[in-house]
Design a protein with these regions (language model features):
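Glycoside hydrolase catalytic-domain context in secreted enzymes
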Residues: 1-132, 136-151, 173-591
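Short beta-strand elements
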Residues: 153-176
Length: 591
């Protein structure tokens, strides 16, 4: 197990807040603040103007190159919310948005427009201080909007005033504008009996919260919640009143007919009726680096590929070039560059018929010892999320399904294949770890890969609270949810995955025993729902729409090859004819 005992105080959020509370001497502990960067030149920047309508804030940030060398500048916007001792936990520095200039020559200036919503500064009240069942809360008070060169160095400030609490729940002010339903506590079972770090009274519980765990046993409730192939009980998930869905119908629809059609359009039910039980089984169970073809609906088989640093495949030798690691991309603080990488990845995938990309990887640099930190963007959920949203948008707009991974709380690799239990409170889950996934999903992402670890006692790939309640119901996600590689089938159970929000298994060596009762109403219904998500993603990918055209250089190469081939054939024909003519003349002379 692993305890996220630090709560929301991850990375710079701890160091900045701990220094403000007098727990640490910042200059003795921190060498380079988060967001720090070097340049060959110098810049002046300030907040030149502010538009504030009470719903969103737009800053005009004036930047001027005051040095002797051309360069770019990043305007970083952090906010410091009002904190009330013993109340909702809040860090003193929180990245909310950023922008980067073009290349500025010496003496050249540029004004950046940076916009964000008030609700982006809300904190999640998992302890029911302001909302009984948990909610995002924008507490009354002064919010310092700081233009910074890094998390510690403030260059200019605008103070936004909130006159009264805004509570984003059904009993008060309704859901946030980006949510389909109001967020409420969904992950209480993952909190466990851990003591979480609190800012109250100047981090008075620091020693207790950071001490070695005293308890190494699951509670009775955690044992009851624990799920595996051995403990799976379909009755906990299946509707006893459900009737067997229609299968094998001849409705004359093809998947291409559903491109661009809304997820809940009745046409989808007609298409799903055409699938046989074997089709449903193959689409959901046989998902290792590919999606099977289904002739009856005109779906050709497609491939999926890894990973965050480029187009790589264990089964297709036509891999693309490797790119710098995602952490390097995040270090550029350059959203247009991230989008361009997504666009290029999509084009490379289209050339080798890979409709799915197992990337980007969204987990957090919780510590420097993360085994796959090079795949992940940052210690900051917002920087990770904004970078990924740009990259995923670039890829999705060009027809590629991005399976953002590993959903969720997979921030170490040791024991992950042994169903390691991750214990954390819901405020940390939502403000740090899920924030990174939330932004690319809400930007139009069509795919998710779950993780091997457990959320508290529940495998992430079979966690309804995560895959249905948060991902689908709250964030409005429609698409494909694949498991991580099924290397531990004793707990990575397909029966559970397809009933809790998963759509296909990254599995191999599939047999008919993969699901307990393949022909039961519950299993067929679950497979149908799962196939809907996968097919919806494919219908809006270049697997069907071919949104990404063949590059011009490929077309040119084909044309040149064809012309050269024609010339060579013509030359060969002429050579043969000339040879035969000469031979006949020689034979005539001999006679």
């Amino acid at each position: 197990f692993v305890n996220y005992c630090e709560g929301i105080y991850v990375g710079y959020k701890f160091y900045e807040t701990a220094a403000a509370e007098g727990l640490i001497d910042y200059d003795k502990v921190v060498q380079y603040p988060f967001g720090y960067g070097l340049s060959y030149t110098t810049f002046d920047s300030s907040i030149a103007a502010v538009e504030d309508d009470g719903e969103k804030i737009t800053l005009d940030v004036a930047v001027k190159n005051t040095g002797d060398t051309a360069g770019k500048y990043v305007a970083e916007i952090f906010y410091e919310p009002p904190y009330y001792n013993g109340g909702i936990e809040k860090a003193t520095a929180n990245l909310v948005q950023y922008a980067k200039t073009e290349i500025l020559q010496p003496g050249e200036a540029q004004t950046l427009k940076i916009t964000f919503r008030y609700e982006d500064m809300a904190s999640y009240d998992s302890n029911g201080i302001k909302s009984a069942n948990g909610a995002y809360v924008l507490e009354a008070g002064d919010y310092k909007i700081n233009l910074c060169s890094d998390s510690h160095t403030i260059l200019d400030t605008y103070v936004a005033k909130v006159d009264k609490d805004v509570i984003y729940d059904d009993a008060h002010d309704g859901a946030r504008s980006t949510d389909q339903v109001a967020a409420t506590n969904q992950l209480t079972f993952a909190q466990g009996d851990v003591t979480y770090l609190s800012r109250a009274d100047g981090f008075a519980n620091y020693a207790e919260a950071t001490a070695a765990p005293a308890n190494h046993s699951l509670s009775a409730q955690a044992l009851a919640d624990y799920a595996s192939a051995a403990t799976f009980d379909a009755a906990k998930y299946d509707d006893p009143n459900a009737v067997m869905p229609t299968t094998g119908a001849n409705n004359g629809l093809k998947l291409a007919d559903l491109a661009g059609v809304a997820y809940d359009d009745p046409k989808w039910e007609q298409l799903l009726d055409e699938l046989t039980v074997n089709d449903l089984f193959s689409l959901t169970a046989d998902g290792g680096y590919h999606t099977v073809g289904v002739e009856s609906i005109g779906l050709s088989a497609t491939e999926d590929c890894d990973g965050p640093t480029g187009v790589h495949s264990n089964y297709n030798p036509a891999a693309g070039p490797s790119y710098p690691g995602s952490v390097m991309l995040a270090c550029t603080w350059n959203q247009p560059l991230a989008k361009a990488r997504g666009e290029q990845i999509a084009k490379e995938c289209a050339e080798i018929n890979c409709a799915g990309w197992y990337a980007p990887a969204m987990n957090i640099h919780r510590s420097a010892f993360g085994g796959r930190n090079f795949e992940y963007y940052s210690e900051c959920g917002v920087l990770s999320g904004l970078t990924a949203a740009a990259e995923v948008s670039g890829a999705t707009e060009n027809g590629l399904i991005c399976y953002v991974k590993h959903f969720a709380f997979n921030d170490q690799d040791n024991y992950r294949q042994n169903n390691i239990c991750t214990w954390l409170n819901e405020q940390a889950a939502r403000e740090i770890y899920l924030k990174a996934f939330e932004q690319p999903i809400k930007a139009g992402g069509m795919g998710v890969m779950t993780s091997m670890n457990a959320v508290g006692p529940v495998w992430a790939g079979g966690c309804k609270a995560l895959l249905t309640n948060i991902l689908r119901d709250e964030w409005g996600f429609h698409g494909a949810v694949i498991t991580d590689a099924v290397v531990s089938p004793w707990y990575m159970d397909g029966n559970l995955a397809i009933r809790t929000g998963g759509t296909k298994m990254l599995a191999f060596n599939i047999t008919n025993e993969f699901y307990r009762d393949l022909n039961s109403v519950g299993t067929v219904t679950a497979m149908r729902n799962a196939a809907h998500g996968t097919l919806y993603a494919l219908a809006n990918s270049f697997a069907v729409t071919r949104a990404v055209s063949v590059p011009k250089w490929v077309k040119t190469t084909y044309a040149v090859d064809a012309v050269v081939a024609i010339i060579l054939v013509a030359w060969e024909v002429c050579a043969i004819c000339k040879y035969r003519k000469a031979k006949k003349e020689d034979e005539g002379t001999e006679q």
